[in-house]
Curated annotation (Swiss-Prot):
Family: Belongs to the TPP enzyme family. MenD subfamily.
NCBIfam families attached to this UniProt entry: menD
Name of the gene encoding the protein in the UniProt record: menD
Catalytic activity reported: isochorismate + 2-oxoglutarate + H(+) = 5-enolpyruvoyl-6-hydroxy-2-succinyl-cyclohex-3-ene-1-carboxylate + CO2
Enzyme class at the top of the EC tree: transferase
Naturally occurring in which organism (per UniProt): Roseiflexus sp. (strain RS-1)
Metal-binding is among the record's keywords: yes
GO biological process annotation, one example: menaquinone biosynthetic process
Protein name stated in the entry: 2-succinyl-5-enolpyruvyl-6-hydroxy-3-cyclohexene-1-carboxylate synthase
Transmembrane segments: none
Role summary: Catalyzes the thiamine diphosphate-dependent decarboxylation of 2-oxoglutarate and the subsequent addition of the resulting succinic semialdehyde-thiamine pyrophosphate anion to isochorismate to yield 2-succinyl-5-enolpyruvyl-6-hydroxy-3-cyclohexene-1-carboxylate (SEPHCHC).
GO molecular function: 2-succinyl-5-enolpyruvyl-6-hydroxy-3-cyclohexene-1-carboxylic-acid synthase activity; magnesium ion binding; manganese ion binding; thiamine pyrophosphate binding
């Protein structure tokens, strides 16, 4: 591999082959040279050369029809790609698995009048199941970029051949040189991240469960993998299933001896025995926790920065992600097995194959968990009262079955760090799809309207509150008795965690954007009760009274963002399990 283009194309095509691609139809051109060479030189791929792109695409369609597996067609940039369209329409309508790989000009030539350059991004519209416009190859790509090429290829094959089968379009821009000419400074040998996990095997296995569930052979393979490794983790991110899932995760943790690290808005942080919630603190900064060998994931990408960093640095040999609907959530591109299946059904099928195991590994996490909450509780009465303590107290005061919505930015992170797991079942919600601060109050009120028989609370920051203040009109119009905890640190407090905080005056003027607002008048305008608090005793009293009375109340806690910022890492350092044993 002599330059970045050859490296990218070779890595992508190699993973397509590992995922099952056997037939590729090639049409001549210049811009697709790296792809042509990668396909022609791969020993597992049979290539068919065609003079015309339209014929090549239909020939690939025939291959896919005959084999019932995805076939690929490759072309250069410009109108060559448009000639794929008739075959793509047919493949879409007939449900035939097909990969369209179109080479493209670099981004700076798009919309510039450059020769043989058209808009190829999503050019096949709704006739494809998935369309990706790849980034330009880099001279020395970081490992995550190389891993992303392999997971992209695995996903492309899985989606094209999934249920229903159809077309996947990958658009690949290249700058010259397109031929295998050596370029000084370009990557010449694959880094470790580019290597497959074992000879001939895919980097990521993608499996979609059938109506009868996950095949027994796959369940047995996963069970065998878990039994081989004592050091494992169960990680539950946001938006895990409801129903029996939480109890099944607890049972899976007991059976495997793996700690279950559950996100504050996973749906199972509160009310399920044995789950771990203090990881944002005990994994903070430098720590002595050994890396896990295997990770079983459910839900979306975790909220916790330090948990994500720990998992990425650990580079487990196996990361098994189970998620109904097949929605991908792996921004570090570490997943080795992606199983699109009902999570509860998967665990139920897996449990009979596992022998109960409990060792020093899980005890280490349980000891760290106990130490974290002991340190947090010891610091709660320290002055001044801070936002994380208010979140801890709100969770501790909510009754069984209550609903809690947390706003984005800091509150959702505070819940993840300071929401102590407990016996009471609390239903926690957040807008973690795009993680915006817009519409959070309205979403919280919608949650309350959907659960009219249980107490409802929301915790939001001041900028989030300001963004959706008009949503408060629904409190009276729709009859939603909600307790809103307003954490007012006079601006975008989360920006204090970013390196830009060292650069004044721009940091204060354009990132924090202090507003100097108090929100008593907003409460009065929309007909809500209002309480401003400054200490722990006042907050706990106001929150308890509002929840018990099912009153529509705004409880405003004014804090200092810089003081809160200093308080959190100091608490984390004091709570860290510094004496964790090496295993």
């Amino acid at each position: 591999m002599t330059n970045r283009n050859i490296f990218y194309a070779t890595t992508l095509v190699d993973e397509l082959a590992r995922a099952g691609l056997r037939f590729v139809c090639l049409a001549p051109g210049s811009r697709n040279t790296p792809l042509v060479l990668a396909c022609a030189r791969h020993p597992a791929i049979k290539v068919f050369s065609h003079l015309d792109e339209r014929s090549a695409a239909f020939f690939a369609l025939g291959l896919a029809l005959a084999t019932d597996t995805p076939a690929a067609v490759v072309c250069t940039s410009g109108s060559a790609a448009a000639n794929f369209f008739p075959a793509i329409v047919e493949a879409h309508q007939a449900g035939v698995p097909l990969l369209a790989l179109t080479a493209d000009r670099p981004h700076e030539l798009r919309d510039s009048g450059a020769n043989q350059t058209i808009d190829q991004v999503k050019m096949f519209g709704g006739f494809v199941r998935w369309s990706v416009d790849l980034a330009l190859p880099e001279a020395t790509p970081p490992p995550v970029v190389v891993r992303s090429l392999r997971t992209l290829a695995a996903r492309a094959m899985a989606i094209a051949g999934g249920e229903p089968p159809g077309v996947v379009h990958l658009n690949l821009p290249f700058r010259p040189p397109l031929e295998p000419t050596p370029v000084a400074g370009d990557i010449t040998a694959p880094p470790d991240a580019a290597q497959p996990r074992q000879a001939g095997a895919p980097y990521t296995y993608c499996l979609t469960a059938t109506r009868s569930g996950v095949p027994e052979a796959v369940i047995e393979q996963i069970a065998s993998l878990l039994q081989q490794h004592e050091r494992g983790l169960i990680v539950c991110g946001p938006r895990c299933p409801s129903g029996e899932f939480g109890a099944l995760v607890s049972e899976l943790a007991d059976r495997t001896g793996y700690p279950a690290l559950v996100d504050g808005v996973s749906g199972i942080r509160f009310g399920y025995p044995g789950v771990i919630g203090g990881y944002e603190t005990f994994l903070f900064g430098e720590h002595s926790f050994p890396p896990p060998d295997v990770v079983v994931r459910f839900g979306a990408v975790p909220t916790s920065k330090w948990l994500n960093q720990y998992l990425d640095t650990a580079a487990p040999s196996a990361v098994i992600h189970v998620r109904a609907g097949g929605v991908w959530a792996d921004d570090s591109h570490r997943v080795s097995h992606f199983i699109a299946a009902d999570e509860s059904a998967f665990i139920r099928a897996l449990l009979p194959h596992l022998k109960e195991r409990r060792g020093a590994w899980i005890q280490m996490f349980e000891e760290a968990e106990a130490q974290v909450w002991s340190a947090v509780e010891a610091a709660l009465n320290d002055e001044p009262y801070f936002d994380g303590a208010a979140v801890y107290d709100a969770v501790s005061l909510l009754p069984e079955g209550a609903a809690l919505f947390v706003g984005n930015s800091l509150p959702v992170r505070h819940l993840d760090q300071f929401g102590k797991p407990g016996a009471r079942r609390i239903h926690a919600f957040a807008n973690r799809g795009a993680s915006g601060i817009d519409g959070n109050i309205s979403t919280a009120l919608g949650v309350g309207a959907g659960r009219p028989d249980t107490p409802m609370a929301a915790i939001v920051g001041d900028i989030t509150f300001y963004h959706d203040m008009n949503g408060l009109l629904a409190v009276r119009r729709c009859g939603v008795p909600i307790t809103i905890v307003l954490l007012n640190n006079d601006g975008g407090g989360i920006f204090h965690r970013l390196p830009i905080n060292r650069f004044e005056p721009e940091f204060t003027d354009y990132f924090v954007t202090p507003h100097g607002l108090h929100f008593a008048h907003a409460a009065k305008m929309y007909g809500l009760d209002y309480v401003q608090v400054r200490d722990r005793e006042a907050f706990r009293r106001a929150f308890r009274e509002s929840i018990e009375a099912r009153a529509a109340t705004i409880i405003e806690l004014r804090t200092d963002a810089r003081a809160d910022l200093a308080r959190r890492p100091a608490l984390m350092r004091s709570a860290k399990a510094s004496d964790v044993r090496g295993l």
